[in-house]
Amino acid sequence: MKKYMVILLSLSLLLPLGSASMAATQPVPGKSTVTIHKSPRVITRKTTGQKKTQLSAESHRKRTETGQKQSAGQMIEVGLQSGSELSLTGLSAFHVEAGSSLGSYPAGTRLTISKSGNGLSVNGKSAGAKIYFKSSGSGAAFAVKGNQYRGVIKAIASPSGVTLVNQVSMEDYLKGVVPCEIVPSWQMDAIKAQAVAARTYAMFHKNGYRSAGYDVTDDTRTQVYRGVSAETEATNRAVMETAGEVVTYGGSPIDAVFHASGGGYTENCENVWGSPVPYLKGVPEDKYATPWKKTISLSSFTKMADVGRLKGIKLSALHIGEAHKTSDRGISGRVKSVTLVGSKGNRVVSGNRLQQIYDLNSTLFDLSVSGNQLVITGYGYGHGLGLSQWGAEAMAEKHGGAKDYYKTILMHYFTGTKVEKVY
């Protein structure tokens, strides 16, 4: 017999019809409070029910084959900016090529690139449909939209006019990614786990935007990348000390997705994106569940419910940090569906839909009534799949010092995997 928590709105009480353990949660000891999840340094993708690439066995095979073929090159192309007219500034001496040399320029030179017929022009001079800006230095080479980048800048004609692409080595790319996706002052094993996950993710998704002329974006559609401008000593160290290492399943790089906090337990892929993936399974983590709360009016919720007079809400009990077996929650306790009971009948609303409507940090939540308010008490931040960044930090704090412990962290969150050096 299923055990449910039923909110009887006429009584404005939370009446448990089964035992419910709402364990108290604590922030990571000795670190910043959980409000750090509001910071862009920790990934804040609240992916819900929107369309996500379905990782079926066949699609996964094709993507991993691509990743294997590309790994030997160790280069990646990142889309930086598109527009009708763009500019860049050389931070050291550089030259411009478009099949042949278009000239050399001293450090500090600013060039403007714009659409010209079917091609491009540089400072008003026609130059072809593809232009390369190459620096003679090895450090920060170019400034684009306020950030500094290593490597080569490629300009290509695009529907919007011109697109600037950064051609850079995989390791230099990661130096500009990792500090944007995690807190650089965290434990080194947590940072290394993020570095390996980011490398693996980039390899798996390489060529994902090839139709636009590059491999990955510089924003949360893939991974946030800010080039040299974002680099720190700690994150650079993590990248270099794990150079060439990726997470593999069956010998192939995985889709190493990550999120800020699992809230005590991560989730199975099929409960978030619809299709099972063998290495994206829910696993328990230290109960640093990063609690959050949101309050909305019962009148607005009743209007959204569209079931007439709202009589009650049916949702099974939440047990933080424990595996769940009820049909309305995923294994972690993330809400799959809520039943709204009304005078016109019942309506089932998905947890993803509620997350979208009310901009919730996650679908790991419980519901209660206080007066004329509906209180949503939640835990965790993000979709709950794969690597939990706060969970990784908690593991690193507890077991820090063990040799290569970041590999243990990764293999905990990505079930049945290995960490291997592929180049």
Language-model features, listed with the residues they occupy:
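Positively charged n-region of N-terminal signal peptides that target proteins for export
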Residues: 1-6
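Bacterial N-terminal signal peptides
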Residues: 8-16
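Sec-dependent signal peptide cleavage junction
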Residues: 17-27
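A contiguous strand-loop segment
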Residues: 52, 95, 100-169
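Extended substrate/cofactor- or partner-recognition/assembly subdomains adjacent to catalytic sites
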Residues: 73, 186-374, 379-380
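Soluble non-cytosolic domains of exported or imported proteins
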Residues: 168, 185-193, 295, 382-386, ...
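Sec-exported extracytoplasmic/periplasmic mature domains
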Residues: 179, 183, 196-207, 306-309, ...
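TerminUS-proximal long segments
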Residues: 377-423
